[in-house]
């Protein structure tokens, strides 16, 4: 028969006894209560709760790294529970996240520093000729002090050799060539002279098609005022020829020989007039082109002189500050 709820009293622990009892008495009381049948098995939830409370009261080992201190009494011993007996309110070193450490994406990596300068690009930018290769055909290796040490990444293997960026390889060779160029600065090769006839001025010149037709020989190539060159003999002034006195020939003397001679003279005079007019037309069209080209070149000369005066002023200030080159 089941007992009423009022008669059910919790049985003593098997291994524990009342306070003040002799050691070993708890075991006898537990055995007696087990034989009498009035003991009740423990619930698993209560056992787990007591085990957590027992672990919470034990002092925890300090964890290396940044820790967070919880609020509590300053004179409380290690492992003491504060805040109404709650195990979560105890004071002492508690492991926590490193809130004061910089984030990974906020770190500044030294990859934006400029280590090398392309000397040829610098010289071309300032209108100077590029540096010639050093004698021997081999450029000296760059100084090891200026070579940045490669930083191994997280996915790099120990057997892989460090590789430099492709943009720095030609810059290092240029830097080595610059060292040999500074040593032989006085023996720099001057640029080869340019043929003035091959230089073309960028300009818009459109002559009249009728003038070009009058300046061209029929059946031949069209006259080009940009490329045509006259010889010194053609440009010499022609003397004025005096017209011969006209001789009156009587009608009875105008025979067949006279008319053939007159015909040949007229044809020769016509050819001479046509050649002279053709040459005059060519010279006039060529002169119009040269006048326009000359005006454009004068403007370029003025701009070049202004730029030259500016560079001379910069050079004089540099020499006054750093001495003669």
From Swiss-Prot:
Residues 1-98, 124-203, 230-255 are annotated as: Disordered. It holds the Pfam family bZIP_2. This is D site-binding protein. Residues 255-318 form the bZIP domain. Belongs to the bZIP family. PAR subfamily. Residues 283-297 are annotated as: Leucine-zipper. InterPro entries: bZIP, bZIP_sf, PAR_bZIP.
